[in-house]
Amino acid sequence: MTRDFDVIVIGGGHAGCEAASAAARAGARTALITHKLATIGEMSCNPAIGGLGKGHLVREVDALDGLMGRVADQAGIQFRLLNRRKGPAVRGPRAQADRKLYRAAMQEAILNHRNLEVIEGGVSDLIVEDGHVAGVIAEDGRQFRARRVVLTTGTFLRGVIHLGTQRIPAGRVGEAPALGLSDRLYGLGFQLGRLKTGTPPRLAGDSIDWSSLEVQPGDDPPVPFSFLTTEITTPQVPCHITRTTAEGHRIIEDNLHVSPVYSGQIEGVGPRYCPSIEDKVVRFRERDSHQIFLEPEGLDDDTIYPNGISTALPEEVQLAFLKTIPGLENVVMRRAGYAIEYDYIDPRELRPTLETKRLGGLYLAGQINGTTGYEEAAAQGLIAGLNAALAERGAEPFILDRAQAYMGVMVDDLITRGVSEPYRMFTSRAEYRLTLRADNADQRLTAAGIGAGVVGERRVMAYEAKARALEAARVLCDGLRLSPTELARRGLKVNQDGVARTAMDLLAYPDIDAGVLAGVWPELAALEPHIAEQMGIEAQYAGYLDRQDADIKAFRRDEGLRLPAEIDYASVLGLSHEVRQKLAKARPATLGQAARVDGVTPAALTTLMIHVKQKRSA
């Protein structure tokens, strides 16, 4: 049996759900093929969404009418805005999520999605015709045809679970790995590597002595992810904090020989910024304790996720170590932690649309590209799914650059620099983070999403209403003006320099907000809280943003010089052999991308720019 679609998405995880939804929203007849319908939207590791850098990605996915932010708002049982004491540019929204509620909400969205058909089954092979993907073959022999296929295989490509000395072929606990696809991709010439990630043991909440632990409450009121969410209605619960001990570290040290991470059993490289507890103990021997966050997995499930102690030690060693932790002296371990090793493809094989250079019509998103994290996967899924749909109807691709979005930063990092370890997003990766804030993701991206046809009517209306409210607030704040003397009479002390100040000028002062100014100008009290907050942020950053805008214009000049796709770097006189090799492998699309290839010097860029301009004028 053969069936035809415009876009086929393989995998029902975070990348796959966003890819399928984006393609369907953009008008493509879309199929999502996944091993089990019941595991669509599964949170395979930690029960949380967002964080520093990651929360920015969730807001950007939401600004483009993606699913993750709205689903997290429905499932969130504790919300916290991280870095609240720092500037708005580096604040990151984060939420603990009830696993069951998250999965149920995502399945509700996917299974009832317009233009989207969900098909249960594994995929064993790609159909390739004349150097272009033409569909997929299911494990049971069914064929599904499409000229655009998005692979979002997560940790399933030749996945192997490691627990002590045990090696268990699996893509996730209890689920078989994808073997045929790995072989097929290798046969097509893709460069595959191995990475690994890990997860901590799961604990029985009723076996923990909560009275001895530090409580970590959420924000009140909670700050939602989605620009469409007006209120969080799910009950909120606290997390708790404890620490490892020197005794526990000794147990780990004594058993490193049976840790697959240190015995040589695992070949893949793990995430630098989410190390196992074995790695922490070995790399930071001077520390006698490490912080652990005890995170609830659900409202009606007392399973606890101990964030910070990912491990693949044997089960009996894990339990012995756990019992040395304050509050866990009598803990019951419901499931042991483990490491999982899997194949990924060098992301330098990709175009900015996340289509592979090697095989037309094939798009990759998520951990198959060497990233780690739900949020990174979701963002890539949206980009890949949307571009697959746009390509199918012959429309312009949807490409975000480093000055537009964290999504643009991530994709650019992946396709120009590649990965040597699992890639995760941080605010420090973005050069223009004053502009790329979580609070303004809709202002930055929703209009572009509307232009690409991926944004629904409800969000269009909300976006336009907010844009009107922001513009009205700017006009109001710029129009309210008083002299220093008049301000002093009203209790606001500013320099008596004779220069009148507007409400917008005053909002730049660290101790003045719209609430304070409402005592001077009562009309400001009518501003909605999120609009008033936006005015304060814009005022606070005004001078800095002017300077950053100049930097962005310079960046765009470099990005504007496109490099010919057929350029022969061996013929560019003045480039070193090393630089020629690196540029030939990366195939950057612009001079700006070439600048971000490791090892390419400013002198090499000048040489390359002169060469390209001479060729064009010849």
UniProtKB/Swiss-Prot annotation:
Cofactor(s), names only, from the UniProt record: FAD
Biological process according to GO: tRNA methylation; tRNA wobble uridine modification
Source organism, top-level taxon: Bacteria
One Gene Ontology term, aspect cellular component: cytosol
Keyword vocabulary terms for this entry: Cytoplasm, FAD, Flavoprotein, NAD, tRNA processing
Residues the entry annotates as binding FAD: 11-16
PROSITE patterns, A to Z: GIDA_1, GIDA_2
Residues annotated to bind NAD(+): 270-284
One family name in Pfam for this protein: GIDA
Gene Ontology MF, one: flavin adenine dinucleotide binding
Localization terms from the record: Cytoplasm
The family this protein is said to belong to: Belongs to the MnmG family.
Oligomer and partners: Homodimer. Heterotetramer of two MnmE and two MnmG subunits.
Function: NAD-binding protein involved in the addition of a carboxymethylaminomethyl (cmnm) group at the wobble position (U34) of certain tRNAs, forming tRNA-cmnm(5)s(2)U34.
Protein name: tRNA uridine 5-carboxymethylaminomethyl modification enzyme MnmG
Native organism: Parvibaculum lavamentivorans (strain DS-1 / DSM 13023 / NCIMB 13966)
